[in-house]
A protein has these predicted regions:
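Terminal substrate-recognition subdomain of acyl/acetyltransferases
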Residues: 1-3, 107-185
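A short beta-loop-alpha structural element at the N-terminal edge
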Residues: 2-22
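Amide-forming acyltransferase catalytic core, primarily the GNAT-like/NAT-type
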Residues: 16-27, 31-38, 164-180
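A conserved beta-strand-loop-helix scaffold within acyl/acetyltransferase catalytic domains
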Residues: 23-87
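Conserved acetyl-CoA-binding loop-helix of GNAT-fold acetyltransferases
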Residues: 85, 91-106
Length: 185
């Protein structure tokens, strides 16, 4: 199978039918990896999809991958979150296509916002680095309490709290558009 045969697009209301499959894929990946992935509700992901704040990958009508975008601090910070590829489609470079699409979407919708990503996975760190993200400490991220509340759904939340929100199992990575003025979207 070739990743190019899989359609990667901005999700819309017609893709809401995939939410349960997305949630199950994320849950299973968290079990296999043994690391924290913050759980989200059906309603939360459905809203992201309906608002056009998500990227979905489909092989015909079959779910292949997903990610969504969240904005914080009055849209001064934007996170690309929940990147997942169904096991059947792993190893094809699909996650890189999904990540690049979410990066473009975030840059188009919020061109001056700082983009950040939290990850414990080497592959995502590599993709982020290729896009221009750099590792930062957590205190360089948004101070928006709604963002930090979302971390409560992660199995590693106690570590984050015990370190006064400065460190966690995840690596925080930041893309500052002010430092990439010559980059095109």
């Amino acid at each position: 199978m070739n990743s190019k045969q899989i359609d990667v697009m901005v999700a819309d209301a017609s893709h809401e039918i995939y939410v349960d499959k997305i949630l199950n894929t994320i849950k299973e990946a968290a079990k296999v990896r043994g690391t924290g992935i913050a759980e989200r509700t059906h309603e939360y992901l459905a809203t992201k999809i309906k608002e056009g704040k998500a990227i979905i990958a489909l092989d015909g009508d079959e779910f292949a991958g997903f990610t969504y975008i969240e904005s914080w601090g009055n849209k001064t910070y934007v996170a690309t979150s929940g990147l997942i590829v169904h096991p059947k489609y792993r190893g094809l470079g699909l996650s890189k296509r999904i990540k690049a699409a979410s990066f473009r979407l975030a840059r188009l919708r919020w061109p001056k916002a700082k983009l950040f990503s939290l990850t414990s996975g080497g592959a995502v760190m590599k993709m982020n680095t290729e896009l221009g993200y750099v590792p930062v400490t957590f205190n360089e991220l948004t101070d928006d309490e709604a963002f930090w509340k979302g971390c409560e759904a992660c199995t590693n939340h106690e570590i984050l709290v015990s370190k006064d929100r400065k460190f966690c199992i995840c690596t925080a990575m930041l893309y500052d558009p002010a430092k990439h003025a010559d980059d095109t979207i």
